[in-house]
Amino acid sequence: MDASLKIVIVDENPIRAAILRDGLHEAGHVNVTHIEDRNGLLARIYAIDPDVILIDLENPSRDVLEQMFQMSRVVKRPIAMFVDQTDTASIQASVDAGVSAYIVGNLQKDRIKTILDLCISRFNAFARLQDELDRAKSALEDRKVIDRAKGILMKAKNLTEEQAYALLRKTAMNENKKIADVAQSVITAAELFK
């Protein structure tokens, strides 16, 4: 694991924060910032721009949990959340919010490195899946646009589907554009003439 990682610890309890900090230092991580007060937390996290965020909440209220979950949805970083007690709804909410590791139970410094590694690995795996999903959605949208443009060309120029696609492809190559961009231009032009 990269020892130069910027890590933020969010913990109102200095004793518990020290356990996290000691565990990180023993694992070779020295670039660690402790945020004790949660007021203005999001702005402070953006200012620090950490690689990983560790949040220790001990026994959080529903409001505090929801505040942390909202923050985790926005920051798009590996987040490990430590709590002493939990329930099924909180676990599900943490997963939905994108928390990479939700750790329940005793906070022990010798577990911090493993938890950090797990947190980063799960975040990266989820990010890869999200990227694949985004690419698949984009390809599907492109396919829909291309199909619609082919239909317009087939009707307007009395072409077969293959001929319409070949025309889109040739135009895209000549203009050094993506086929989907040319297809969108065809759709836009057709809508102007309605």
Give the residues covered by each predicted segment.
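Conserved phosphotransfer microenvironments
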Residues: 17, 38-42, 51-71
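A short, hydrophobic beta-strand element within the central beta-sheet of small alpha/beta folds
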Residues: 53, 77-86
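C-terminal output helix
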Residues: 89, 107-116
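C-terminal output/effector regions of signal-responsive regulators
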Residues: 134-194
